[in-house]
A protein has these predicted regions:
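Donor nucleotide-sugar binding/catalytic pocket of nucleotide-sugar-dependent glycosyltransferases
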Residues: 107-141
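Membrane-proximal helix-turn-helix segments that form the acceptor-binding/catalytic region
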Residues: 44, 92-109
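Aromatic "clamp/platform" in nucleotide-sugar-dependent glycosyltransferases that forms part
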Residues: 224
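Short alpha-helical donor nucleotide-sugar binding micro-motif in glycosyltransferases
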Residues: 205-206, 212-216
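Short His-centered aromatic/hydrophobic patch
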Residues: 55-60, 80
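Conserved donor-binding/catalytic core segment of Leloir-type glycosyltransferases
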Residues: 144-162, 168-171
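Conserved acidic donor-binding segment of nucleotide-sugar-dependent glycosyltransferases
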Residues: 256-257, 261-269, 278-284
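Short hydrophobic beta-strand element within catalytic cores of glycosyltransferases
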Residues: 241-245
């Protein structure tokens, strides 16, 4: 029986559920620079060795690589669910070379979406790469959203690659033309928005999302890049119709489900505004059909199915490294 360590930064609820299927040994490496450095220094004196280290995200690589240097037989599997490889070309030379050096120690990848898998494949086509979609952990299948409302929703943190700022600009375009839309921003994204409008509701972090799922009609996520935000699955569970870019992980699912009309060609504010109107102006029968299909899609990606798939993929990958 192989000894497996899961190193994490929290972890994300879904990633934790995945990890539980393969190990009970967990180690928190930290979610901020001071904590990561402190734990890295402490790990220098840690003599424990493991056959496999499953790493949640790129920030955990220094700790895992240090263990591999001390115990070269250790295998590292990266649960790739962040923007590390997307950000790589934009890094300064020193940082990029450091990250590339850390990445070279990885033996295999489990990406959180085909989008992330494609990015990994561009850099590491000679290493085993699999993908397993996450799932919504705050689903609301009992709710039927108000498909006729002009209330729009975005949920996310303050990472600017999510481009909630462009969504604000898009809704301003619509309201300047006489349309009466409200935009609800939930999460730390609000810290990056300095403008104020009567129609812009900066909600911040919220424990209960149901009140937004009940009265909104569209969930808009116009990211430059977002691996596979579970908020898309969660919004769809209440029947909200998503509008996303091709660079959001769920875009492959929408394309495969015949819902390519919900994918933005680009995330320019004018294009976002046009897509909101296009979907919002559809007849009730069409919106009901799409809303129900969104619920069905969301229900397919759940804890049981995805955790089992992760376990299967993990051990399949182990056989290859």
């Amino acid at each position: 029986m192989k000894s497996i360590l899961f190193t994490h930064q929290g972890p994300h609820k879904v990633h934790g559920a995945f990890a539980r299927t393969v190990t009970k040994n967990w180690y928190r490496y930290g979610d901020n620079q001071p904590e990561i450095i402190k734990n890295l220094i402490k790990s220098v004196f840690d003599r424990k060795s493991y056959d496999v280290i499953l790493v949640e995200g790129g920030l955990g690589l220094p700790h895992a690589v240090l263990k591999k240097i001390k115990h070269p037989e250790t295998k590292i599997i990266l649960l790739y669910a962040d923007t590390l490889l997307y950000d790589l070309p934009k890094m300064n030379l020193l940082k990029r070379k450091t990250v590339e050096r850390l990445l070279s120690y990885i033996d295999g990848f489990i990406a959180i979406s085909p989008l992330n898998k494609r990015i990994v494949s561009q850099h590491y086509h000679n290493k085993p790469i699999y993908h397993v979609y996450p799932y919504g952990s705050n689903n609301s299948f009992e709710i039927d959203c108000d498909l006729e409302s002009h209330d729009l929703l975005f949920i996310g943190n303050h990472e600017m690659c999510k481009r909630f700022d462009l969504l604000v600009d898009a809704v301003k375009i619509l309201n300047d033309r006489g349309y009466e839309y409200n935009l609800y921003l939930v999460g730390s994204c609000v810290s990056k928005i300095d403008v104020d409008y009567p129609w812009l509701h900066k909600e911040g972090f919220q424990e209960d999302l149901n009140k937004y799922f009940k009265h909104c009609s569209l969930y808009v996520h116009p990211a430059d890049f977002d691996s596979c935000p579970v908020t898309v699955f969660e919004a769809m569970s209440s029947g909200l119709i998503p509008i996303i870019t091709n660079n959001v992980g769920e875009s492959d699912i929408l394309n495969e489900s015949g819902l390519e009309c919900l994918i933005l060609k680009n995330n320019e504010p004018e294009m976002i505004a046009e897509k909101i109107l296009q979907i919002g102006n559809q007849n009730k029968k069409w919106k009901n059909y799409v809303s129900l299909k969104c619920k069905e899609i969301s229900s397919k990606y759940n804890n049981e199915t995805q955790s089992k798939l992760f376990k299967d993929v993990f051990y399949k990958l182990l056989d290859e490294i």
